[in-house]
Amino acid sequence: MFLEYREGVLHMEGASLAGLADRFGSPFFLISEARLAANYRALERGLAGAGVRAVLRYCAKTNHEAAVLEVLARSGSHLLASHAAEVELALRCGFPPERIAYARPVLLPEELGAVLAAGVPLVHVHRPADLDLLETAAARAGRRVRVSLRLRGEGGLALSPLDWLNRRLGLGSGEVLDAARRLARSPRLELAAINFYLGTQQSSLKGFGRAFRRVLALLQRIAAGTGVVVREVNLGGGIPSLSLRKVGPRRLLARWRDLPGSAGGPERQEELAAQLGRRFRELAEGVRLPEIPILAAEPGRAIVGDAAVLVSRVRSMEGRWAFLDASRNFLPESPLLFSRRILPLAEPPAAAAGNPGRYYHLSGSTLNTLDVLDLRRRLPRLEPGDLLAFCDAGAYSISRASPYAGLPPAVYLLQEDGETRQVRRAGGIDQLLHPMTLREEPARVGR
């Protein structure tokens, strides 16, 4: 098993997390090379088994550690970059430029120039004015550039604040048709894809089905009006990490107790990908298009989320509060939005033996009032020195870790051969000072 207790100690891919904590200290991140590759292959197999041509572009902003990118480059993944430095990093990690796409809601002329000079062939466009910038950049680079138009969510009331915020990005259906007509006349730009985004952690086939119908209807109108055959439909990100739970009112009142095996895993990812692929193929076969488009996706959480854990130590206790040496700096997403499994490294006694544990609030190590890692979490009785593993810690964690009131922890890669290698040093004074410009002598206080 990926996570399991052996002789009373939590192991990840056969490696003792307590043993690693003794070696490395805490807190630290541990990423599984095998799990990364398995998650990617599961999505790839699921879509291929559904009988659709597919492209998977790993969303690099989810976790752009070089060790992660190297594993995925070797696996054959494509990549979605969100800034020019990410493009450069992807190239250094083994991604050829033809397997890189670029998406940023605010396109900057200087950055577009660098991205096109690097050979990136596909750029996402979020608003009509972006076409002017891209046309100019393509002409300066002497390049013909493929364009993916982002289709904005429409229809009905937004069901959540996040849904409402998401609708600020992209083009409406009429704007997509206008852009398609313009691109059909452009000597430098080619309409290659329509993309959309339903939101994070989407597992409902109904939502994807509605979006597929809408995009396929647009492709028919584009083909009829311009003669252009759009060859790719991109469902964007949102494919979930199946071990991460959305939080609702019921969750906030519950007292959960986590188990190592109560997670998703590559098998469930493959099943979900197959369901998405079959639904897309069924709908595409029902419309009049010259060919079934390629189905593209930009998974992030689904690949890297459950491939990592954050190990942290309880440093002190005060009533129901356990104070840890990790903080929300390392896991920035609010526990009021998502809930991850939290496992003690020492196997808890069986509840049947009269040890049900108790519920705790888990505080981070900073003075930030909101530095709370979880609330009302049922765990075995905790004492200072106890170790906890925060599961599903691979997405939007290391890439967003900051030196606010504490420095980011080290990151280690658990290799497929069972060896552990450090892939990011813990934050130190050099990291803190590197971007700063200082006077040659210390500043004097007062007059």
List the predicted regions and their residue ranges.
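Short, solvent-exposed loop/turn segments at the edges of secondary structure
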Residues: 95-97, 164, 407
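A charged N-terminal "starter" segment
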Residues: 1-145, 185-186, 190, 224, ...
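General structural feature for long, well-ordered alpha-helical segments within catalytic domains
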Residues: 16, 32-35, 39, 43, ...
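Short beta-strand segments
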Residues: 59, 146-152, 195-197, 234-236, ...
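Active-site loop/helix belt of alpha/beta enzymes
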Residues: 154-313
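Short acidic, glycine/serine/threonine-rich loops at helix termini
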Residues: 69, 92, 112-116, 134-137, ...
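Charged (often Lys/Glu-rich) extended helix/loop segments that serve as interaction or gating elements
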Residues: 271-286, 290-447
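Active-site-proximal loop/turn and secondary-structure-junction residues that shape catalytic pockets
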Residues: 62-64, 85-86, 106-108, 127-129, ...
